[in-house]
Amino acid sequence: MQSTDTKEKNKNIGGPVEHTPLMKQFFAAKSDYPDLLLFFRMGDFYELFYDDARKAARLLDITLTQRGSSGGAPIPMAGVPVHAYEGYLARLVALGESVAICEQIGDPALAKGLVERKVVRIVTPGTVTDEALLDERRDTLLMAISRSKQGYGLAWADLAGGRFLVNEVDSVDALEAEIARLEPAELLVPDEDNWPEFLRGRIGVRRRPPWLFDADSGRRQLLAFFKLHDLSGFGIDDKPCATAAAGALLGYVEETQKQRLPHLTSIAMEVASEAISMNAATRRHLELDTRVDGDTRNTLLGVLDSTVTPMGGRLLRRWLHRPLRLRDVLVQRHHAVASLIDSGADADVREAFRALGDLERILTRVALRSARPRDFSTLRDGLALLPKVRSILAPLDSPRLQTLHAELGEHDATAHLLISAVAEQPPLKLSDGGVIATGYDADLDELRRLSTNADQFLIDLEQRERASSGIATLKVGYNRVHGYYIEISKGQAEKAPLHYSRRQTLTNAERYITEELKSFEDKVLSARERSLSREKLLYEGLLDALGTELEGLKRCAGALSELDVLAGFAERAQALDWSQPELESAPCLRIERGRHPVVEAVRDQPFEPNDLDLHSDRRMLVITGPNMGGKSTYMRQNALIVLLAHIGSYVPASRAVIGPIDRILTRIGAGDDLARGQSTFMVEMAETSYILHHATPQSLVLMDEIGRGTSTYDGLALADAVARHLAHTNRCYTLFATHYFELTALADESHAGGASGIANVHLDAVEHGERLVFMHAVKDGPANRSFGLQVAALAGLPKAAVTQARRRLVELEQRGGESRSAQMAPTALDAPQQFGLFTAPSSAAQEALQALDPDELTPKQALEALYRLKALL
């Protein structure tokens, strides 16, 4: 389809179209990038025209105006100032847009006619490397997807961090899970039909010609890029689908970046079996770094992230979204955290890191030769910290910390080079001068002396000329247009010496030049120009020198990032009273006094800790209790404890013993998915189906209120069937919260001649009059009432409606007769209670107190109970 800009170019109004020279130049540049916004440099602004202008005005909320006409039609125009363009560019990139930047080539003042322009840079959401366009604590990823009969190949690159990885998955569900995990900023797919629904309408999707996603051509591209004869060293020789995706990605990067990418030195194959699998729904339900409502506050990452550096923050996010199953790796991380805590070294590391910049991304800019002067000073200061960090790690008894100590390396020569070459506080831009330190280069120092001494020369000259001419008001000055001058007022101009040559006439003064001043001007201006040229040459030399050290420096940055994460784990463990988890090879999941890390962090009152005990003969807990009683919190906290243990962190529990876990799967509530045309019940069943098809005996499954999206009997039947399937077919660890009390009978049934593997637990509440206090304590056995009407009253339902509901409940329970299980026999417990004439009603505090067993309480539990009792008074 022809773009509007092309139509504008081809308009024919009353005869042959003749565009202005400027518009011809614009259309020539735009024709090479029809799908990108074109930033067209015109003096101090980047201008956009036609469709680009209309789109930019809408997205950036800038003024849409006109710039005369061309080809017989008005020219829509919008623009952004050059000095502030990065902010606008960042907003466009965040919205999934790509931009081609067309610069003026050469000096416009010297151009004869139209100044030459050329596209010098392409910025896309997945290829940005500029600091101003990046989220410092989140990876910016470019991903490509290819597909075959066997499944999908994925390749993704973090150009700002220098990472390049691939993977293959066998289903649409697995593809969606990977995209949810990685959250690419830009996604390349073949321009074909029948792509999964979740990709349609996604920001940043780029459709590319299908022939670019070819395994053979991808292999050739990778071999040429890495200068290899085979790919066996990368482990992708037998991964044609992943190779096709990698080739498509690499081709796109080379096409858009227009330069070599020396910082991409390898490609890694991710092994799915090394990590705990979590689908998109699980990540959403557990609110790892984003809440269901889109808010990023009060999430697990928000509580856990105590990293000091941006690169440490990005690594933590990667770990959080890919918990490992590799026990040896995790044990080493736990041991490293323990060593940092026991020695107190975590505080020393974190204090040292406060002066550490984002070395990972700085090294990328060095490799791409786009590093700015202050990148050099930040790298210099970071390398200067290494001796101190190495001395902190040296005595610690931790295999992982000793490995990191070795990976830091010794970069004394590089540090010395930067210390001697880079000014203490360099300017923002190389063109400002003063980047290279005094004493580093004798020629540069001499040129600078000429410039520096200029001020004193001008003062001396002014005094001499005043004395020789007798004109006390004579001044020596400089402007960028006319250069150096001697200025004499109009009234004194007749006294100007004969050797003065008039340079400029002003309203109230005349300006002159002398041979001496002209000679000085040539010398000084030449010195300044030569000084900047010399400085640029030295700057390029620094880039060359650092380029030879990139591999070692990247390893160093990686070690610093991991050390930052581990020291952050140590700080969190001490600040939040977390404990070191124990990873067992036998199947079990035992958590003593576990807490929800996020809920505990945001609430003012002490959190009620709870236990969990699952093993081979006890694989499912049916959890009952009142709404708002804490069932969902209890389930989530156990999943989060398992997840934290598998990234190397300590956990919010007094003890956690965890056997092998391969998946965490959840079905915890959902709003209507109207955007995809799915009702709550449809979402519920789709997520349940996924769990039933994928859960294994090593999976942890959370099921919350299955069957609530349909009729009572349908819902009960489905909940019963799902619970039985999970317990007897999947045989996974399951926390099954339900409002169907009939399901509590499952624990009493036998299966295949043995125990059911199902146990009942409940959360209770204490009611006094119209008050209801949730105890949040998990106890053995089923609940005996739901407190639904009391919760409705707490939610603000009108009293008349609650009273009517109580009456109706009594009628329904009486009509139900003996049809329900004996344990859940109908009663009028939710009806108002009539106390005897001489019987004083017990208080909520009394009832809670009677439920306590002082002999079973630890001092901390007793204190927590005291807080709860006080709240009841």
Named regions from a protein language model:
Residues 1-339, 347, 351-367, 371-463:
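Charged catalytic and DNA/RNA-contacting regions of genome-maintenance
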Residues 19-23, 39, 50, 79-89, ...:
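Amphipathic alpha-helical transducer elements in NTP-driven molecular machines
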Residues 213-221, 228, 276-277, 282, ...:
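Amphipathic heptad-repeat alpha-helical coiled-coil/stalk segments that mediate oligomerization
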